[in-house]
Amino acid sequence: MADVYLDNNATTRVDDEIVEAMLPFFTEQFGNPSSLHSFGNQVGLALKRARQQRAGVLGEHDSEIIFTSCGTESDHAILSALSPARAQDLITTVVEHPAVLSLCDYLASEGYTVHKLPVDKKGRLDLDHYASLLNDDVAVVSVMWANNETGTLFPVEEMARMADEAGIMFHTDAVQAVRKLPIDLKNSSIHMLSLSGHKLHRKGVGVLYLRRGTRFRRCCRGHQERPAGGTENAASIIAMGWAAERALAFMEHENTEVKRLRDKLEAGILAVVPHAFVTGDPDNRLPNTANIAFEYIEGEAILLLLNKVGIAASSGSACTSGSLEPSHVMRAMDIPYTAAHGTVRFSLSRYTTEEEIDRVIREVPPIVAQLRNVSPYWSGNGPVEHPGKAFAPVYG
């Protein structure tokens, strides 16, 4: 029986057509696109088309597209908004991807002031609180478009408009949003936007959208890839162009069929498994993402048993990296620790089938029951009221 892959918010399988599009640029068309000879010209024209393909998905001009090595490098473009001669404050959220949070923590250690917007129990932001922080001391706002754990969507268009009106640069990490949601930047107030190929059924390349007129300070010197330094990774960039077109072609499928399968997965599990619930904003989230909290057990244990039966998912907990704390996203949402430890993220793609979802719905309930039978929080058919000190809460 084939394995079931439901960890597409971590990375995606490479589209077969995209592999075919890449191959010639490893063998026949291998020139440096900056060269004047025909080998370089061939690749240069292909890169121009890839830039246009990528721009077409986002609705912006191809001159505003910069290719990078990954989404994290694109996220670090927020450094370009900072200067000792200008404002020193940053605004982000407590639930950002580590690519942004770790950078903000580093900047805080260097003397910058970082304001982290809190979220409510559904992972939503308070725009009134956000508005109160917009002032002349703020240099840049960086807010993800969609949360990678819960799929909760943030109102980045409105937040960008508010920042722009205050004269503040706005960046969004759209890595999780781009293949699943229509994005049109033509009339947007967003100054910078980050993407990653490996969430688009492509590997090894990132994209930075930089609105024309936005100041940008290079982190890596060189001239080849516009404001970013370094010779272009031609095969990966060209594949990214194809990935962009394929994402646009499958957009409706993501928002109808993938969402239907996601909803079926959630309903099927919750109908059978008691003391479980979906985290995040139920009305405003990605169509492919289901983050389910299974109370009174450990998410990592669920993942290990799922893996034994050929199902790949991921946990909201950081335990696999040596920490016993739930993820920063679950803690920020104030999910009870008996539930936050048991979160599992199922993230679907256009390759997910009905049969796979049916299989997951069959396999999850007995795994949860097996783990609860050995949990100090569980006895018989329900939770223990006073489990003692077997597991102490790791946060308030």
Swiss-Prot record:
Positions contributing to [2Fe-2S] cluster binding: C319
InterPro entries: Aminotrans_V_dom (IPR000192), Aminotrans_V_PyrdxlP_BS (IPR020578), Cys_deSase_NifS_bac/arc (IPR017772), Cysteine_dSase (IPR016454), PyrdxlP-dep_Trfase (IPR015424), PyrdxlP-dep_Trfase_major (IPR015421), PyrdxlP-dep_Trfase_small (IPR015422)
Catalytic activity: (sulfur carrier)-H + L-cysteine = (sulfur carrier)-SH + L-alanine
Pfam families on file: Aminotran_5
UniProt record, GO biological process: amino acid metabolic process; nitrogen fixation
Residues that, per the record, bind pyridoxal 5'-phosphate: G71, T72, N148, Q176, S196, G197, H198, T231
Keyword entries, A-Z: Iron, Iron-sulfur, Metal-binding, Nitrogen fixation, Pyridoxal phosphate, Transferase
The keyword Disulfide bond is assigned to this record: no
Active-site residues from the entry: C319
Gene Ontology MF term list: cysteine desulfurase activity; iron-sulfur cluster binding; metal ion binding; pyridoxal phosphate binding
Necessary cofactors: pyridoxal 5'-phosphate
Enzyme class: transferase
Residues with the N6-(pyridoxal phosphate)lysine modification: K199
Enzyme Commission identifier(s): 2.8.1.7
Keyword Metal-binding among record annotations: yes
Oligomeric and partner information: Homodimer.
Record-stated family: Belongs to the class-V pyridoxal-phosphate-dependent aminotransferase family. NifS/IscS subfamily.
Biological role: Catalyzes the removal of elemental sulfur atoms from cysteine to produce alanine. Seems to participate in the biosynthesis of the nitrogenase metalloclusters by providing the inorganic sulfur required for the Fe-S core formation.
Protein name per UniProt: Cysteine desulfurase
Species assigned in the record: Azotobacter chroococcum mcd 1
Gene (UniProt): nifS
